[in-house]
Amino acid sequence: MRQKSVRIAVFEQAAEIYYMDILETIKEQVTANPILLYMKGSPEQPQCGFSSQVSQALMACGEKFAYIDILSNPEIRANLPQYSDWPTFPQLFVAGELVGGCDIIMEMYNSGELLPIVKSATSE
């Protein structure tokens, strides 16, 4: 019985370390890229309508941006909502801060608020 509980404790500790590693990876991605979009698919081949809308809005701003395909990165997909405290995808980070998801980004794009935020992130 004792050995079983030790194994469980070791497994739980390993799971905690793995979880922390994923969160650290996300943090590094967010801080290393002035504009980062977590999306389904790629800007050239989005795999959902929301990701398509946001990537098109970003491309219309005329600045380069990084993206991560969460469909190809299941660990990121599973843990990003805990990191960002945002439950849905896509998620746009600018200058290390979460800007929002599709509805917010499209509202900002249509009102002209997105362009200056994107431009300021690339000029820093």
Describe the residue ranges of each PLM region.
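Non-catalytic, surface beta->alpha helical segment in thiol-disulfide oxidoreductase systems
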Residues: 94-123
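Eukaryotic intrinsically disordered and solvent-exposed regulatory patches
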Residues: 23-24
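Short, Lys/Arg-enriched N-terminal segments with co-localized hydrophobic residues
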Residues: 3-19
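Thiol/disulfide oxidoreductase modules built on the thioredoxin-like
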Residues: 82-88
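Local sequence-structure signature of Cys/Sec-based thiol-disulfide redox active-site neighborhoods
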Residues: 28-64
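Thiol-based oxidoreductase modules, predominantly thioredoxin-like and allied folds used
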Residues: 59-77
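Short secondary-structure boundary/capping segments
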Residues: 27-28, 106
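Acidic beta-strand-to-loop metal/phosphate-binding motif
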Residues: 38, 91-95
